[in-house]
Amino acid sequence: MREPFQAILSSLAKVEARARAETSRGTCCVFLLASTIKVLAVASLLAFTLSCSSKPDPNTLVMIIESSPTNLDPRIGLDAQSERIDDLIFDDLLTRGNNLDVAPGLAERWDIPDPLTYIFHLHQGVKFHDGRPLTARDVKWTFDSLLQGKVRSAKAAVYRFVDRIDVADDYTVVFHLKEPFATLLWNLSDGAMGIVPYGSGDEVGRQPIGSGPFRFVSAEQDKDVVLARNDEYWGEKAHLSKVRFIVVPDTTTRALELRKGSADIAINALTSDMVLTLERDPNLAVMHAPGTVLAYLAFNLRDPILKNERVRQALAYAIDRRPLLEYLQRGFARPANSLLPPESWAYNGDVPAYDHDPARARQLLEQAGYPEVNGVRFHLTMKSSTEESTRLMAAVLQQQLRQVGIALDIRTFEFATFFSDVTHGLFQVYSLRWIGGNEDPDIFEYVFHSSKFPPNGANRGYFADPRVDALIDQARHELDRNTRKQLYAELQRTLADALPYINLWYFDNVLVHSKRVRNLTLNPSGNYDFLKTAELDGSRQSSVVSRQ
C-alpha cells in the first residue's frame, strides 16, 4: 500500500515544481493550468484513501492544527494556537462581537467615571476548574504578575498604561491608568488575557487552570492537546464531551486525515485547491465566511525609488488582484482597501481605490522620472517566504509589473531568515499577512507611527508622516466613539494616498468538517469559538450556521 501512496506524492511534487517554473515564465493561463493539474493530483491522492477510512470516536471531536501551542499560560502565549486554545480554557473580562466590538464577559458591566479609571463588576458564582471561586483578587493577580515581572512576557507592553489595580470588593476590580488609553477594553477581551487563579506562577503553561467552557486534560509537544467539557461552567455549557487537537504540519496529510475520517475539523489549514477537492466528498462539508486576516505588500520608504509616492501608487495601479483572487485564492478571499477589515466599527470604505489601470501606472512612473529604457524603467526586489501560495503570487505580480516596465526580482527564504531581514530593514518590497492584530484600530500606531520603527514596533517600512502621527495620537486618547471613528476615517484616507502598504485581500475563514459535526458557527476572527456550540451527531447529518 505504501508504494502507490509514495508514487502519488512524488508525482504531486513534480507537478508543483513544473508549475512554479512555468508560472515564473508564463501567463495567468499557465497559472490556471498549474492549479488545475494540482487539483487533479490532490484528488488522486485523496481517492487513494477510500480503503483506509477510520471509525471516529463518538464522544471526541478531533480537530487538526498546524503546530503545537507554544505556551498555554494566557499571560505568555502569543502564537495563534496558544491564544485560540486559551480562549476555550480561560475567560477574559470581556468578549468580542461580530462587529469586533467589546461585550460583557467575566465582567457583567463596567463604568468609566473618568478617563483614567475603569471599574469592572464581575459575575458572581464563577469557579475555576479546580473549584476555587473566581474573584477580583484573581483578576488583580493576573495583571500584577505580568506588570510586576513575576511572569516575564512580551504581553506586559500591552498594559504599560496601567498604573495600578485595586480590589474594591470580591466582585469589583478597578483599573487606574497613567494616561487615557481608549484601547484598554479591547485589550481585556477574547483571548487577550484570560484570568488565572491567585498565586499562579509558571506552572500554568504546563497545567493550565481556567474558568472557561473546556478544561485542560493533557498535552504532548508536536502531537496533541486534549480538552474536556467543563460541566460546572457558569455560562452556556459546551455540547462536546471532549476535544482533541492533533498536530499535523503537512498540508496534504491534513487533507488525508479528514478524508479518512480520523479527523473531524480543520479551519484555515488547507490550500484552496484541497478545499475544492474535499468539498466533493459525501462525508465532508465546507463552510466559509468573511475573515479578517490581511495579505499585503509593504515598501521600504528609505529606498531611493520607493520613497517616491507616485512610484508606490503606480505599483498599486499595475497590480490586478482579480486573477489572484480567482485562481490562487479560488474565491476564498475579498479585496482589501484598508488595514482594518470591513467588520471593524472603525473601518472606512470611502478611501481612494487603486483599480487595475496600467495606463495610469505608466503615467505616474513617467511623472516620477522613470522613463522606459529597452522596456525597463527600474528593478525592484521582492522578498517572501517559501510558502507555496506566496511564491505563486509573487510570480504573477512579476508578470503584471513587467507590463508597465518594472522588473521585479523575487527572492524566497525560509521564514526565520525572511522575517529577520524584514525586521532589520533589509528589503525593498515584501509580502506578509496580519493575523488578528488588525481587528482593532490601535494597530495603526504599531504599524505606521514614526515612533514604532523596529525593534519598538512593526513600522518596518520606516514610514513617517506628522499628519499620521497626530491622528493616531489623538484617536488613541479619545474616548468618544464617534470622534474616534472620524479620526480613524481621516487616517485611513491619508494612508490610502501615501500608500506605505498595498492592501491586497482579506482571507475567508474556511472550515472543512465531517458531517457528523453540527451546529457550527464562524466569526470573522477565525478563532475556535465554534467548538463552544458544536455537537457530534451519530447520524452524520450536518446543520451548519455561518454567522457573518
Please tell me what each predicted stretch does.
Residues 511-540:
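Long beta-strand-rich cores associated with HINT superfamily self-processing modules
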Residues 202, 231-276, 398-399, 407-409:
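Ligand-site clamp/hinge motif
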Residues 229, 306-399, 464, 471, ...:
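Append "and occasionally in soluble cytosolic enzymes with long acidic Gly/Pro-rich linkers
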Residues 52-55, 221, 368-436, 481:
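Ligand/substrate-recognition segments at binding pockets and active sites
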Residues 119, 407-418, 446-515, 539:
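Extracytoplasmic/peripheral linker and loop segments enriched in polar/acidic and small residues
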Residues 111, 121, 155-197:
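Surface-exposed binding/hinge segments that line
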Residues 65-114, 144, 207-211:
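N-terminal lobe/hinge region of extracytoplasmic solute-binding protein
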Residues 101, 180-181, 186-238, 242, ...:
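Gly/Pro-rich hinge or "lid" segments in bacterial periplasmic/extracellular proteins
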